Amino acid sequence: MAPPTRQLLNAVLVLLLLLATNHQGTGVVVASELRCQCLTTLPRVDFKNIQSLTVTPPGPHCAQTEVIATLKDGHEVCLNPEAPLVQRIVQKILNKGKAN
């Protein structure tokens, strides 16, 4: 095979792979939602920096409880649900919600 033909074949192959990847892109997002979101956790975070808190119970997507804090600067951090400080933060937020 002559070099220009090989380059053309490689370019076509790359284009086909990109099109196939782009077409399957939606499925990849769904697959990533079906697994644990927290790979590492923090044992503590300053309560004043938390904007919102999401607690996801164990389920088919993940066998462990996940606590995800959205901080006031927009960052999301995973907290260790077993840590006493995290449990107190969750209780404070739950009690605050009951008071309203």
Curated annotation (Swiss-Prot):
Protein localization: Secreted
Gene Ontology MF annotations: chemokine activity
Record GO cellular component, one term: extracellular space
Broad class of where this protein is predominantly found: secreted
Listed SMART domains: SCY
Disulfide bonds: C36-C62, C38-C78
GO biological process: cellular response to interleukin-1; cellular response to lipopolysaccharide; immune response; inflammatory response; leukocyte chemotaxis; neutrophil chemotaxis; positive regulation of cytosolic calcium ion concentration; response to amphetamine
Signal is among the record's keywords: yes
Induction line: By lipopolysaccharide (LPS) and inflammation; in lung.
Tissues and organs where the protein is expressed, per its UniProt entry: At least expressed in the lung and trachea.
Superkingdom classification of source: Eukaryota
Keyword annotations of the record: Chemotaxis, Cytokine, Disulfide bond, Inflammatory response, Secreted, Signal
Stretch forming the signal peptide: 1-31
UniProt keyword Secreted present: yes
Quaternary structure annotation from Swiss-Prot or TrEMBL: Homotetramer.
Function of the molecule: Chemotactic for human polymorphonuclear leukocytes but does not induce chemokinesis or an oxidative burst. Contributes to neutrophil activation during inflammation.
Family stated for the protein in its record: Belongs to the intercrine alpha (chemokine CxC) family.
Protein name: C-X-C motif chemokine 2
Organism this protein belongs to: Rattus norvegicus (Rat)
Lineage: Eukaryota, Metazoa, Chordata, Craniata, Vertebrata
Name of the gene this protein is made from: Cxcl2
